[in-house]
Amino acid sequence: MRIGHGFDVHKFGGEGPVIIGGVAIPYEQGLIAHSDGDVALHAVCDALLGAIGAGDIGRHFPDTDAEWKGADSRFLLRDVYSKVKDKGYRLGNLDVTIIAQAPKMAPYIDAMCQAIAEDLETDIGNVNVKATTSERLGFTGRKEGIACEAVVLINAQ
């Protein structure tokens, strides 16, 4: 049994939608990123990579590599999870916290859980996604960007 923690943040800019947890959320702006800017899936990738001692998402999908420009983060997550399985582990459970003043995440949480569960080949009951605000404090509170944290438990197969 191993645990991993991940964190990601992206700044608003350009046109929407915002992609979070593999789900497109209508919003007046998108997130500035080399890939699709999905902070939730990036945090999950980092948590999984951390759990197997394999560094971070930037090491595996560097933003200096044109191959990953505009990449679908669901593809990245599936690739990372294949590395987890190659090391002899499977997901136990996952807990994700999205920190954003806007857009509102609640209507999209179930779809996020479903998408993530599919990509991680697990029962939806093993995936929890929640959202909170920072009570209008800091960059997320000023609607300048979105942050996300993820914690995973993986077990030997």
From Swiss-Prot:
Keywords: Isoprene biosynthesis, Lyase, Metal-binding. 4-CDP-2-C-methyl-D-erythritol 2-phosphate binds at residues 8-10, 34-35, 56-58, 61-65, 100-106, 132-135, 139, 142. GO terms for biological process: isopentenyl diphosphate biosynthetic process, methylerythritol 4-phosphate pathway; terpenoid biosynthetic process. Pathway: Isoprenoid biosynthesis; isopentenyl diphosphate biosynthesis via DXP pathway; isopentenyl diphosphate from 1-deoxy-D-xylulose 5-phosphate: step 4/6. InterPro entries: MECDP_synthase, MECDP_synthase_CS, MECDP_synthase_sf. Its cofactor is a divalent metal cation. The keyword DNA-binding does not apply. Transmembrane segments: none annotated. Its EC number is 4.6.1.12. A divalent metal cation binds at D8, H10, H42. Binds 1 divalent metal cation per subunit. The record marks H34, T133 as: Transition state stabilizer. It catalyses: 4-CDP-2-C-methyl-D-erythritol 2-phosphate = 2-C-methyl-D-erythritol 2,4-cyclic diphosphate + CMP. Gene3D superfamilies: 2-C-methyl-D-erythritol 2,4-cyclodiphosphate synthase (3.30.1330.50). GO terms for molecular function: 2-C-methyl-D-erythritol 2,4-cyclodiphosphate synthase activity; metal ion binding. It is an enzyme of class 4 (lyase). The keyword Signal does not apply. NCBIfam families: ispF (TIGR00151). Involved in the biosynthesis of isopentenyl diphosphate (IPP) and dimethylallyl diphosphate (DMAPP), two major building blocks of isoprenoid compounds. Catalyzes the conversion of 4-diphosphocytidyl-2-C-methyl-D-erythritol 2-phosphate (CDP-ME2P) to 2-C-methyl-D-erythritol 2,4-cyclodiphosphate (ME-CPP) with a corresponding release of cytidine 5-monophosphate (CMP). PANTHER family: 2-C-METHYL-D-ERYTHRITOL 2,4-CYCLODIPHOSPHATE SYNTHASE, CHLOROPLASTIC (PTHR43181:SF1). Homotrimer. Belongs to the IspF family. HAMAP family: IspF (MF_00107). This is 2-C-methyl-D-erythritol 2,4-cyclodiphosphate synthase. It comes from Photobacterium profundum (strain SS9). The lineage of its organism: Bacteria, Pseudomonadati, Pseudomonadota, Gammaproteobacteria, Vibrionales.
